[in-house]
Amino acid sequence: MTANQTKKSVPSFTSDIRQGVSNEGCLVLYSGGQDSATCLAWALEHFDRVETIGFDYGQRHKVELECRENLKQKLIQNFPDWAAHLGEDHMLDLAVLHQVSDCALTRETEIAFGEDGIPNSFVPGRNLLFFTFAATIAYRRGLRHIVGGMCETDYSGYPDCRDDTIKALQVAINLGLERRLVLHTPLMWLDKASTWQMAEEVGGKELVEIIRQESHSCYLGEREILHDWGYGCGHCPACELRAAGWESYQKSRS
């Protein structure tokens, strides 16, 4: 098997994780979006103790934060074995990001791409801060593993979603805390179709349906229109990416 095939193979990756850390605890960066919801389910399947952390950073729409709680409750109701492993939720106020960031996720600005190819939905430093605060909570809670839904395959040009960024951040965090925390990004080499597939492998069609209906990706906060792939405006980059992934996922199953 080539290195590229290994990166894109969900079964081989999940098997490797299952061997080493299932008896430990982790902290999941959980926003209520498709990626973080998939990572939460993945963590509940692979770790004995799972806590979550979310951030209110002055987003244009609070819909994702509302979906965050609804989706978690659906997981608790439909997956009682997971519910036994789900612990405390930590919600942090990072309103300072709204003060220092002028982007389409924190301002009423039309989504567009800059000359460098990075969309103006990029919040500079967001994931750097998220992981740093998560590491602080993990340190205090005695959790060695932190799970995030960053993805380089579908990362829309966000530099803080790159594998190199996360690896460098892990080194910096461990030096600064004098710990050996592990930053897990199980979606890093998966496209959106493979992310849907991963959800099915972790929790079956029931989990896929929960993520489809309860998670939120739309940059415009649209929750009135239910498409085959979930709620959203259908036109923003996040909706287009999610829709294309769903279509590819469905084709792979036929």
Curated annotation (Swiss-Prot):
Keywords: ATP-binding, Ligase, Metal-binding, Nucleotide-binding, Queuosine biosynthesis, Zinc. Pfam families: QueC. SUPFAM superfamilies: Adenine nucleotide alpha hydrolases-like. Its cofactor is Zn(2+). It catalyses: 7-carboxy-7-deazaguanine + NH4(+) + ATP = 7-cyano-7-deazaguanine + ADP + phosphate + H2O + H(+). Catalyzes the ATP-dependent conversion of 7-carboxy-7-deazaguanine (CDG) to 7-cyano-7-deazaguanine (preQ(0)). Belongs to the QueC family. Zn(2+) binds at C218, C233, C236, C239. Gene3D superfamilies: HUPs (3.40.50.620). InterPro entries: QueC, Rossmann-like_a/b/a_fold. This is 7-cyano-7-deazaguanine synthase. Its EC number is 6.3.4.20. One of its GO terms (biological process) is queuosine biosynthetic process. Disulfide bonds: none annotated. Binds 1 zinc ion per subunit. It is an enzyme of class 6 (ligase). ATP binds at Y30, S31, G32, G33, Q34, D35, S36, A37, T38, C39, L40. The gene is queC. It comes from Zymomonas mobilis subsp. mobilis (strain ATCC 31821 / ZM4 / CP4). Pathway: Purine metabolism; 7-cyano-7-deazaguanine biosynthesis. The keyword Zinc applies. One of its GO terms (molecular function) is ligase activity, forming carbon-nitrogen bonds.
